[in-house]
Amino acid sequence: MTMLNFTYYNPVRLIYGKGSLDEIEKQHLIPEDARIMMTYGGGSIKKNGVYEEVLKHIKPIVEFGGIEPNPSHETCIKAIKIAKENKINFLVAVGGGSIIDATKYIALGMEHTYSDDPYDICLKGGKFKVNPAQAKIGVVLTIPATGSETNCWGVISRHADKLKLPFNNESVFPTWSIVDPCFTMSLPDNQIRNGLVDSFVHCIEQYIGNYHLNPVVEAETEGVMRTIIGVSHKTLENHQDYQARITFCYAATVALNMSLLCGVTLCGGAHAVGHELTSYYGLAHGETLAITTPGVMRFNKEKNAKKLIQMGEQVFGIKNSTPEAAIEATEKWFKSIGMKTRLSEWGKGKEEFETIARKFEGNPAGAHKDIDYKGCLQILNDIY
């Protein structure tokens, strides 16, 4: 059991804290020749004052709103067309992971020349040559969860064929990301809960299925998980608790800024199955992970026994832990913050199970590559 060779690269200028938008001018974050498109979601930023605050610091040529949760290829195509028409060279995403992912996809899509369908960026799994994005990206984060503000990954859905697939490309690392916790304080509880789960599961998936030894990363991952658990009820019960919220925001950033992957491998099984639950049942990303994560943990209980025991002891403080105890503690914490952990709790049926499981034929997921058709079907029935 040894540490894998690795290269760590993260060029994002991360700017944290109250009043951080002022750093746009102080640090000259916008080039003089910038032709800016500002992207955002359903309009909540216009209700909570974030929109007006951002416009004090940037002057967009054009705005593109209406990007949905679990952003769609269909919506992004419209934005790509507008960006090209306006010769955009700088994109500012104001929102959470969905807005940031869509903005990265828009930046890559502007350079796409391989077919009429930029979704090739996802369909090819990011493994074929993609023209690098030329437009720079800035981020004003309003929802802590995905860590997309400091990585080069994204996930895009295509509704036409119920696909939800990831992509990655170093050219879409944001140039800078601003995180002012005050911009997150108007979030409803369900979005905070989903963010807590998403960030926690990012840690789990870089931890429990991993037998490559990097004790530094291991300790850091355990610390981030403990922090998320420790701050979860505080930040839910008092949205104005600045220390609790900035702690949660930073934990979510670190959970997927790629530093926890140094010298180790990524599992990704809970996310892979969760993406399908979003596509076929319409559940939010965090809602799916609260369901799939305990199921994937149970599915790999024997293979991951050592790390589950360690997680139980180091993260949950269980003396003489067992794999089962760690899994139960994880599910209990999900429930304690108000998450449903069974698909049946959402009133969903089993009618899509066969179709979902077929997606994993020849394309197994998980650290052990054992979530294939049969494995996925077993997990789906277990989490029902």
UniProtKB/Swiss-Prot annotation:
Keywords: NADP, Oxidoreductase. The keyword tRNA processing does not apply. It catalyses: a primary alcohol + NADP(+) = an aldehyde + NADPH + H(+). Its EC number is 1.1.1.2. The keyword DNA damage does not apply. PROSITE patterns: ADH_IRON_2. GO terms for molecular function: alcohol dehydrogenase (NADP+) activity; butanol dehydrogenase (NAD+) activity; metal ion binding. It comes from the Eukaryota. Belongs to the iron-containing alcohol dehydrogenase family. Has NADP-dependent alcohol dehydrogenase activity. This is NADP-dependent alcohol dehydrogenase 3.
